[in-house]
Amino acid sequence: MAFGPAAMGYDRAITIFSPDGSLYQVDYAFEAVKKGWTTLGVKTKNAVVILGEKKKASQLLDVDSIEKVFLLDDHVGCSFAGLASDGRILIDYARNSSLQHRLVYDEPISIDYLTKLISDVKQMYTQHGGVRPFGVALIVGGVDRGVTKLFMTEPSGQFMPYQAVAIGQGGYNATDYLEKNYKEDLSVEETILLALNALKVTLKPGEKLGPGNVEIGFATKEGQFRKMTLEERANYLQKI
């Protein structure tokens, strides 16, 4: 995203709107999300799947140490695209909020409410001086009382429910694939394979999708949210 000299006076302060109604610092935060590794979520009647791509930015990088799918509570997980440090802060906040809710109310936090709490924090960082927006978008999904839920939170603090959503570098291509192939009545396995195929279409020539460069978390409407093992990921990748 490029801005001319006329815009420069408006992108220095987060609390000043430009004449066209933009907050340029928030727009810049969206650009950080677009540069992130491809991340997507799919929700059907039977399952919620969240997966995140892992890339080896350096030959010396231990890619196995990179975590892209996170457990927030027994019934809900998330992934993100954008600045990893910003994502880590919000994930820690979400985990603490989930734990406090359990301690106070003796029940799991609803996914809708947890997503709202995350988004409220993001929104606060768009209207105060001396801070900057979070340069990260989170995909949050899981199961509430047998009902599958999937949300995406934007750097602006807005959040929306989705049947399927993709963000990051390959977000456009993955979204196009999901729009053409999504069905609400897919089985658990079909939902997982749909998500993997959507990620596969984002790969550049010469790139391969292997169990070591993708993380997958899922929940069925009968069970809890959990992350797949390396062996489970390898088995599913053989089917696409």
UniProtKB/Swiss-Prot annotation:
Subcellular location: Cytoplasm
Record-linked Gene3D superfamilies: Glutamine Phosphoribosylpyrophosphate, subunit 1, domain 1 (3.60.20.10)
One Pfam family linked to the record: Proteasome
Activity-regulation annotation: The formation of the proteasomal ATPase PAN-20S proteasome complex, via the docking of the C-termini of PAN into the intersubunit pockets in the alpha-rings, triggers opening of the gate for substrate entry. Interconversion between the open-gate and close-gate conformations leads to a dynamic regulation of the 20S proteasome proteolysis activity.
SMART domains: Proteasome_A_N
Protein name: Proteasome subunit alpha
TM spans (from-to): none
Entry similarity comment: Belongs to the peptidase T1A family.
Organism: Metallosphaera sedula (strain ATCC 51363 / DSM 5348 / JCM 9185 / NBRC 15509 / TH2)
